Swiss-Prot record:
Protein name per Swiss-Prot or TrEMBL: Probable alcohol acetyltransferase FCK4
Gene3D superfamilies (alphabetical): Chloramphenicol acetyltransferase-like domain, Nonribosomal peptide synthetase, condensation domain
Designated gene of the protein: FCK4
Keywords assigned: Transferase
Pathway: Secondary metabolite biosynthesis
EC number: 2.3.1.-
Protein family (similarity comment): Belongs to the alcohol acetyltransferase FCK4 family.
Knockout mutant characteristics: Results in enhanced production of cytokinins.
Length: 490
């Protein structure tokens, strides 16, 4: 779509910010299409007031109730394949298209469906929103005490970040337990919701919300690290990160593990006792597993990225922006050099905890100085993201994995028959970024689930499945027996 076409659109809200434009470019090039979050909701069977045939309508009504309170769910995007993509206010949303219904007997079957769904581009974004809900029900649930629905939300990353997907599900639970009669009457008439607002309450860009600052020497150093050829940086280690960047995505693979509430709470408690966090423990365990499974040379190491929410740095006078679904996130890179990998390759539990503590200290040093010298500051100099991404095709990647941990998702304060049982957060890293995406989320007092998502052919399936098995074995050991059980002879 050309600038002349989208420039005349009558409902333009604002231009996409630098970070948002990164995701519109990724979508335009087919490099990154959707973020997903699957929530398992339960309701006692005797309280369920709907039959399977009407469940979709019941959920649709609740989704409408959420949408009417969230500007990000009422916008489209124009000019994705240009230098100036923009958000536009939609005049209507057809919920027969946005909320669909399907059968799935298990989380496994939902994950298989999601592998295909994550590769679907968003259709007609100038007239349709960049979100979709697929409601999965268990076909044999009639004889159970609990009716279980799995709500699969997928979103365009320029509109939602991971934290926003969690907010959607908690808002949906609240809407299900506290239905608005006016919304129900509206949905009884037609699945098409007409929108009259202009979305002037749409959240600001993170660059406008947060006062990013930077030192000139830091800027020069970061640009050197990004742009300078490797032969001019002889003291850095060689990175191993799977196959080179390949824009031809043939398939996406998803594997996951689940920890019950007792194990989850035991692991969280132990992390606190060791003065680290679940995020840093997961990064340490990923590094340990990969170091033992990847055939590395003595000069090779890993680099990982950890997602960081920027919402804590939004000023209090802009507080409404903290609760809106939007994009407000960055990441922090951490190196695992050859010396570190050699150590953890032969390490036992004590050494693993030492590294998890060091990662926590490093992360704290970073967040203590934010938003000063934060990578988001550099995005203003990026130019056209499409050119940047295309220039990376076929080149070796730097980062091996990215970790995004949504933490413990609090259930709504208002009580009702609908409850949030678990959440499976799943996104794959952009083609021109990490080879593997590790995503974690838990429900307050409930299960924790960890997904591993990767582009087919970039990493060997056996390698990722081995990492998944290691994480599960070590975390279950920690939760049940009190120790990770990592042996130097593994």
């Amino acid at each position: 779509m050309t600038d002349s076409i989208h420039g005349g659109h009558p409902n333009i809200i604002r231009s996409c910010g630098a970070s948002e434009s990164m995701w519109t470019a990724s979508h335009a090039l087919g490099l990154y299409l959707r973020v997903s979050n699957i929530a398992t909701l339960t309701i006692p069977t005797w309280k369920a007031k709907f039959k399977k045939s009407s469940a979709s309508h019941f959920i649709r009504t609740a989704v409408v109730q959420v949408m009417l309170k969230q500007p990000a769910m009422r916008v489209g995007i124009i000019g994705e394949n240009s230098k100036q993509p923009r958000f536009v206010a939609l005049s209507s949303v057809d919920f027969s298209q946005q909320v669909e219904y399907a059968e799935a007997p298990s989380v496994d079957s939902v994950a298989r469906s999601l592998e295909k769904l994550l590769l679907q581009p968003w259709p007609n974004l100038s007239k349709r929103p960049g979100w979709h809900v697929r409601v999965f029900h268990e076909p044999s649930s009639a004889d159970k005490d609990v009716c279980r629905l799995r709500i699969c939300l997928t979103v365009h990353h320029a509109i939602f970040d991971g934290e926003s997907t969690a907010r959607f599900h908690t808002s949906l639970i609240d809407a299900l337990n506290n239905p608005d009669p006016a919304v129900a009457r509206m949905m009884d008439k037609s699945p098409v919701v007409n929108l009259t607002g202009d979305c002037r309450d749409y959240p600001l860009t993170q660059e406008e919300l947060i006062n990013f600052t930077a030192d000139i020497f830091w800027i020069a150093s970061e640009l050197w690290n990004i742009l300078a050829p490797s032969f001019l940086k002889p003291f850095t280690f060689q990175t191993w990160a799977g196959e080179p960047y390949n824009p031809d995505i043939q398939a996406i693979n998803i594997r996951y593990l689940s920890l019950n509430p007792i194990v989850t709470q035991a692991v969280v408690k132990r992390c606190r006792e060791e003065k680290t966090t679940m995020t840093n423990l997961l990064n340490t365990l990923c590094a340990t597993s990969l170091a033992r499974r990847v055939p590395l040379t003595e000069r090779q190491g890993f680099v990982n990225l950890t997602a960081v929410s920027l919402r804590p740095w939004i000023p209090e006078n802009l507080h409404p922006n903290k609760t809106c679904m939007s994009v407000c996130a960055s990441s922090h890179a951490q190196d695992f050099g050859p010396d570190v990998l050699a150590k953890i390759r032969q390490a036992e539990d004590a050494t693993i905890w030492e590294l998890a503590v060091k990662l926590r200290q490093d992360m704290k040093r970073r967040t203590d100085t934010m938003p000063h010298n934060e990578f988001s500051y550099l995005l203003r100099y990026a130019g056209d993201w499409r050119d940047i991404f295309q220039a990376r095709y076929g080149k070796p990647r730097r980062e091996l994995w990215t970790l995004s941990n949504l933490g413990s998702i609090a259930t709504p304060a208002s009580k009702g028959p609908w409850e949030l049982e678990s959440v499976l957060f799943a996104q794959f890293a952009p083609v021109v970024s990490c080879a593997l995406a590790v995503n974690a989320a838990s429900v307050e007092g409930g299960d924790m689930m960890v997904s591993l998502v990767w582009q087919d052919g970039i990493l060997e399936t056996d390698l990722v499945e081995g990492v998944r098995d290691d994480l599960e074995m070590w975390l279950l050991g920690l939760g049940n027996e009190g120790n990770l059980g990592i042996s130097s002879s593994m």
